[in-house]
Amino acid sequence: MPATDTNSTHTTPLHPEDQHTLPLHHSTTQPHVQTSDKHADKQHRTQMELDAADYAACAQARQHLYGQTQPQLHAYPNANPQESAHFRTENQHQLTNLLHNIGEGAALGYPVPRAEIRRGGGDWADSASDFDADCWCMWGRFGTMGRQPVVTLLLARQRDGLADWNVVRCRGTGFRAHDSEDGVSVWRQHLVFLLGGHGRRVQLERPSAGEAQARGLLPRIRITPISTSPRPKPPQPTTSTASHPHATARPDHTLFPVPSTPSATVHNPRNYAVQLHAETTRTWRWARRGERGAWMPAETFTCPKDKRPW
């Protein structure tokens, strides 16, 4: 016979977010809520109804915003963690395409999303929305599919008279991580361009700016590093050709040869930047760009004022 005691307990459904707070030794023993505390039980059920209404309102708002791309959300999205994880992975691509099509720079990321830079993923370029087959904006899968060089495609379209843009400007530079054979992330440089007719971004992977200059994409200016080896000083004019009486026949560096350290001259950023600035470039920001091998025309490169690279 079942017990008819007034102090007997019954099971009260808990909020999914509160289920993980139950201790393990209570999983098969007495629940927490008792029938004597009907007021607390009623408040708990009221809170659950409010939460369900809140979730339904959020789902309705998302359904109205995204149209039919997102199915109706569950009343409790975290009720089953496995289903929620599968739900999020299944609809991630649809949501990404939708956000990309909202506007020109909605969620495309420029030039690489910061989260993707931290994560080091290499599929960020292929996650863009799929454009029409006759659109050669070169952003998304058209720029990397089949490893076709973007410059060749652009020149071919312009040669055939199918290019509806009149200017190609450099938008800036970015970096993308590739996993090498040793499992180490190798960062390669990007030159991101804008097509004047489309307004879409053109991605061009280049290991250095010299190759882009050789293809005619950069101004013809010498941006190659100059020699940083110490140069002999010009002879100083003297009034007498006789040697100094206290000058030794053999200097100290011949008695105790000091091996020259190339890292002290070549890999010293201060000396390298100073010589590059003095002989090759005009201002300090051009020197820094030439030093790191990233050429960005100042009149076409835009970035936030407090995050300038110079």
Curated annotation (Swiss-Prot):
Changing residue 159 to A: Almost complete loss of interaction with host DDB1. Residues 1-12 have a biased composition (Polar residues). Residues 238-248 have a biased composition (Low complexity). Residues 35-44 have a biased composition (Basic and acidic residues). Residues 153-159 are annotated as: Involved in the interaction with host DDB1. InterPro entries: HHV5_RL1. Residues 1-44, 205-252 are annotated as: Disordered. Degrades the host antiviral factor SLFN11 via the cullin4-RING E3 ubiquitin ligase (CRL4) complex. Interacts with host adaptor protein DDB1; this interaction allows RL1 to recruit the cullin4-RING E3 ubiquitin ligase (CRL4) complex and promote SLN11 degradation. Belongs to the HHV-5 HKLF1 family. This is Protein RL1. It comes from Human cytomegalovirus (strain Merlin) (HHV-5).
